[in-house]
Every structure is written in C-alpha cells, then in structure tokens.
Amino acid sequence: MFQPAGHGQDWAMEGPRDGLKKERLVDDRHDSGLDSMKDEEYEQMVKELREIRLQPQEAPLAAEPWKQQLTEDGDSFLHLAIIHEEKPLTMEVIGQVKGDLAFLNFQNNLQQTPLHLAVITNQPGIAEALLKAGCDPELRDFRGNTPLHLACEQGCLASVAVLTQTCTPQHLHSVLQATNYNGHTCLHLASIHGYLAIVEHLVTLGADVNAQEPCNGRTALHLAVDLQNPDLVSLLLKCGADVNRVTYQGYSPYQLTWGRPSTRIQQQLGQLTLENLQMLPESEDEESYDTESEFTEDELPYDDCVFGGQRLTL
C-alpha cells in the first residue's frame, strides 16, 4: 500500500501521541503492490496491452484478458500503471477502458481505486483523466477516505483543484460532507495539517465550517485551538466559524485555550465568545480537559512511505 508522504508539523507534541503514532505506523505497513508482481510478468502485461488494437465492435471490453489479471494485493493493470507512474501507458489504458465503470472503479484489497492511487502518487493529470473517463470520486478506501480526503491530508492543492472542479456538483456536495472512519471531513483534515489555502478553498466551495466530529463534537475551530495554530484560527473566524459552538462535553473553543501557550488565540476568541462559555466549570481543572483532546490517527502526521513492506526515508 502507498502511504501519503510525511509533512512535518510544528504542532507535533511528545507524550501519549508518540505511542499512538508508533502503533499506527506499524499497522499501516501494507504491501503497495510494487513487489507482488515480477518484472517479467509486468512487462508481459505491458506487451499484451500494447498489442491490443481491436475496435469495440470487434470484441467486447470484457473479452480483453489483461483486465482480468490481478496481483496478490488486488491491484489491476491500471492500478499498477499508476503506482509505477507510467503516465503514457496509464493514459492509453484509460482511453481504452473509458466508460467501463466497473474496471475504472475497481478497488484493490485496501479499497483503493485508481483515483485514490493517482492522488497518493501526486499525479493530478491522471486524476483528471480518470474523472473524465467515469471514475467515482465518492468511493472510500479502507480508512473511509475519498480521494479528496487524501488530497487534503497530503496538502496537494493541484489534486484538490482537479477533484473539486472536474466532478459534478452532486458529487462535490456529497464529498464535502463525507466523514472518514475517524469522523473527519475534508475540511477537518486540511485544518489538522494546517493547509490554509485548502481550508479557504473548501469553505468557498460550500464546506460546512462548523461541521462537528461525530465522536466528540469538535469543529475545525476546536481543532485549530488544540493544535495551537493562530493563523488557522484567524482564517476560520474570517470564514464564519461559530466561536460559541460547544463540543459534546460542553467546551467552547475559548475554553480549550486554558492551559495552552498561545495568548494570541485566547485574545482572538475572548473578544467574541459569550461570557458564560469562557470559564471552565468550577469542578473542572486544567488537567481534567485532557480527556477532551485525545488525538485520532488523522492528527498523527505521516513521516514515512512504505513500499513492499520496506520503509523509505524521504
């Protein structure tokens, strides 16, 4: 499996999160499919494809044998062409299978479609071709991420632009509302990783700036406070974030500033927050808040890339 490349974050903290991160990196070491097919077998598939020049009326699409071949990871020939970044070959395959939605949207063992892999490998041109050929941008991988979730997580503005401009308005509306299996929308992921341009772009497209995580009710503004990102706080306020929206435990973004180092964030929110949502309950102390801000795996940044079970240093 391909994993998004790491993006070092200033907000990374030591402590319990380190243990979570190590466990997550171990769990995420999946085979990418690169080593599951021998070079000779891959070259033979390439040769067979290049020899195919039949018109649709001469043979149905399903009759082409290379479409039926899968690796042990469930990768199709199109998956492999994208993984290996064989762009001319990938475009040729897409051209031949245009309209064959079952093949274009086929998901490997990790539930990744060719569109997911185009985003992971940072090939926005391929992603655009796949969308125009009929790929479904709403399909999710094994973590519940759509391709747009991955693009926001990686901070690839070019892929975000392709995915939001090429899909239909109906698809776009659904994807912007969709949450992955950690309860995060695309806006949440862009906020967590501090990609301000993507945050602003998503809100402009109609993303709900006050969307709450299903598990604890944090909004993007709560996340910005948790991650101590004053620039993100400013942007979210500019985009209409509700400073008085509380989590399911009743905490406003301002209340999360207690015990945090950024006085700038506290000043920003203090001017706008209702008085009764500024002080912590008398029965609470600053340490009791720790249960509110447990980090999910989405908030632990990728810092490695795994190919065939081997970690690469970027």
UniProtKB/Swiss-Prot annotation:
The keyword Amino-acid biosynthesis does not apply. It is found in: Cytoplasm; Nucleus. Residues 1-40 are annotated as: Disordered. One of its GO terms (cellular component) is plasma membrane. Residues 15-40 have a biased composition (Basic and acidic residues). There is a cross-link at K21, K22 (Glycyl lysine isopeptide (Lys-Gly) (interchain with G-Cter in ubiquitin)). A motif (Destruction motif) lies at residues 30-36. The modification Phosphotyrosine is found at Y42. Highly expressed in lymph node, thymus followed by liver, brain, muscle, kidney, gastrointestinal and reproductive tract. Phosphorylated at Ser-32 and Ser-36 by IKKA/CHUK and IKKB/IKBKB; disables inhibition of NF-kappa-B DNA-binding activity. Phosphorylation at positions 32 and 36 is prerequisite to recognition by the SCF(FBXW11) and SCF(BTRC) complexes, leading to polyubiquitination and subsequent degradation. Polyubiquitinated at Lys-21 and/or Lys-22 following phosphorylation at Ser-32 and Ser-36. Monoubiquitinated at Lys-21 and/or Lys-22 by UBE2D3. Ubiquitin chain elongation is then performed by CDC34 in cooperation with the SCF(FBXW11) E3 ligase complex, building ubiquitin chains from the UBE2D3-primed NFKBIA-linked ubiquitin. The resulting polyubiquitination leads to protein degradation. Also ubiquitinated by the SCF(BTRC) complex following stimulus-dependent phosphorylation at Ser-32 and Ser-36. Deubiquitinated by USP38, leading to NF-kappa-B inhibition. Pfam families: Ank_2, Ank_5. The keyword Phosphoprotein applies. The modification Phosphothreonine is found at T291, T296. A motif (Nuclear export signal) lies at residues 45-54. The modification Phosphoserine is found at S32, S36, S283, S288, S293. A motif (Nuclear import signal) lies at residues 110-120. Its main location: cytoplasm. GO terms for molecular function: identical protein binding; NF-kappaB binding; nuclear localization sequence binding; protein sequestering activity; transcription regulator inhibitor activity; ubiquitin protein ligase binding. ANK repeats lie at residues 73-103, 110-139, 143-172, 182-211, 216-245. There is a cross-link at K21 (Glycyl lysine isopeptide (Lys-Gly) (interchain with G-Cter in SUMO)). The modification (3S)-3-hydroxyasparagine is found at N210, N244. GO terms for biological process: B cell receptor signaling pathway; canonical NF-kappaB signal transduction; cellular response to cytokine stimulus; cellular response to tumor necrosis factor; interleukin-1-mediated signaling pathway; lipopolysaccharide-mediated signaling pathway; negative regulation of canonical NF-kappaB signal transduction; negative regulation of cholesterol transport. Inhibits the activity of dimeric NF-kappa-B/REL complexes by trapping REL (RELA/p65 and NFKB1/p50) dimers in the cytoplasm by masking their nuclear localization signals. On cellular stimulation by immune and pro-inflammatory responses, becomes phosphorylated promoting ubiquitination and degradation, enabling the dimeric RELA to translocate to the nucleus and activate transcription. Belongs to the NF-kappa-B inhibitor family. Interacts with RELA; the interaction requires the nuclear import signal. Part of a 70-90 kDa complex at least consisting of CHUK, IKBKB, NFKBIA, RELA, ELP1 and MAP3K14. Interacts with NKIRAS1 and NKIRAS2. Interacts with RWDD3; the interaction enhances sumoylation. Interacts with PRMT2. Interacts with PRKACA in platelets; this interaction is disrupted by thrombin and collagen. Interacts with MEFV. Interacts with DDRGK1; positively regulates NFKBIA phosphorylation and degradation. This is NF-kappa-B inhibitor alpha.
